[in-house]
């Protein structure tokens, strides 16, 4: 099938430099409305990938996001949110970006063009057959990502990808390709815009669904979140109040004693059950 680089096609808008601020903002918002529809069409593939990942993570497997530039930064961002949000170790979801941590703030020349570097970085993490590699690249042509996915697949490791072009080279290396076709960017070729928004949405969907299925959420609450600041301590305290009907002071003391909402609630209920016996 033909590889069409939609991400490089001309914008549907012209003379951007002659538009008013309001016109530019309204145009961008109009284009952004298309992103959610494109993501919705990709849900069957997202579901397929997530369904394959869940049992792997339950057996100790990890998820590696790999990308360059905006795509790499979004992968690192999503991975970095898993420990504080769900109380998981930082080794469960790992974001790798071409050029390393320096590339999070500054471009690293030619880093994404190295076909072998991605796999070398995965080897440093002792990647194994229970793990999953998810490549992220709007174009679907990033050598750093493609090389890592190709070698991972040769070693029997599950591969997925998120791209904004159909039938891309990256998609051919994925067991489950997620193609989210958002159309030409408002600024021609600026894939940090709609493509980046779509990537962020899909990464949210993947990681959140997996964490819910792993039992890291109860009801609709982040009962395993890390208590890293006063706002989160207050949030956790109010969760306990809602669940156990304690006053604020007792709920907060219980939370701080046990370190998480889930542990605090379980300990309180065990204690009460023992008392009643």
From Swiss-Prot:
Known pathway: Amino-sugar metabolism; N-acetylmuramate degradation
Pfam families reported for this sequence: GKRP_SIS_N
Catalytic EC class: lyase
Reaction catalyzed: N-acetyl-D-muramate 6-phosphate + H2O = N-acetyl-D-glucosamine 6-phosphate + (R)-lactate
EC number(s) given by UniProt: 4.2.1.126
Active-site residues, as the UniProt record annotates them: 81 (proton donor), 112
Keyword Cell inner membrane included in the entry's annotation: no
GO molecular function, one term: ether hydrolase activity
Keyword annotations of the record: Carbohydrate metabolism, Lyase
Domain SIS: 53-216
Function according to Swiss-Prot or TrEMBL: Specifically catalyzes the cleavage of the D-lactyl ether substituent of MurNAc 6-phosphate, producing GlcNAc 6-phosphate and D-lactate.
Family membership noted in the UniProt record: Belongs to the GCKR-like family. MurNAc-6-P etherase subfamily.
Listed PANTHER family: GLUCOKINASE REGULATORY PROTEIN
Miscellaneous comment text of the record: A lyase-type mechanism (elimination/hydration) is suggested for the cleavage of the lactyl ether bond of MurNAc 6-phosphate, with the formation of an alpha,beta-unsaturated aldehyde intermediate with (E)-stereochemistry, followed by the syn addition of water to give product.
Name of the molecule in the record: N-acetylmuramic acid 6-phosphate etherase
Organism: Bacteroides thetaiotaomicron (strain ATCC 29148 / DSM 2079 / JCM 5827 / CCUG 10774 / NCTC 10582 / VPI-5482 / E50)
Taxonomic lineage: Bacteria, Pseudomonadati, Bacteroidota, Bacteroidia, Bacteroidales
């Amino acid at each position: 099938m033909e590889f069409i680089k939609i991400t490089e096609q001309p914008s549907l808008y012209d003379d951007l430099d002659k538009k008013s601020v309001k016109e530019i903002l309204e145009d961008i918002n109009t284009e952004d409305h298309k992103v959610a529809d494109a993501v919705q069409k990709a849900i069957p593939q997202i579901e397929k990938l997530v369904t394959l990942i869940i049992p792997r993570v339950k057996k100790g497997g990890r998820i590696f996001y790999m990308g360059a530039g905006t795509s790499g930064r979004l992968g690192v961002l999503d991975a970095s949110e898993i420990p504080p949000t769900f109380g998981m170790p930082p080794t469960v979801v790992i974001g790798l970006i071409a050029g390393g941590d320096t590339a999070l703030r500054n471009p690293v020349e030619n880093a994404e063009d190295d076909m072998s570097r991605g796999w070398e970085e995965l080897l440093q993490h002792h990647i194994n057959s229970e793990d999953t590699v998810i490549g992220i690249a709007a174009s679907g042509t990033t050598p750093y990502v493609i090389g890592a996915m190709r070698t991972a697949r040769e070693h029997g490791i599950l591969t997925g990808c998120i791209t904004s072009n159909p039938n891309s080279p990256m998609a051919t290396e994925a067991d489950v390709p997620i193609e989210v076709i958002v159309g030409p960017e408002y600024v021609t070729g600026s894939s940090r815009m709609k493509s980046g928004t779509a990537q962020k949405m899909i990464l949210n969907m993947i990681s959140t669904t997996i964490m819910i299925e792993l039992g890291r959420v109860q009801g609709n609450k982040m009962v395993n979140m890390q208590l890293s600041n006063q706002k989160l301590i207050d949030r956790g305290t109010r969760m306990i109040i809602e669940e156990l009907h304690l006053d604020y002071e007792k709920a907060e003391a219980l939370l701080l004693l046990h370190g998480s909402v889930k542990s605090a609630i379980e300990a309180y209920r065990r204690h009460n059950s023992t008392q009643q016996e």
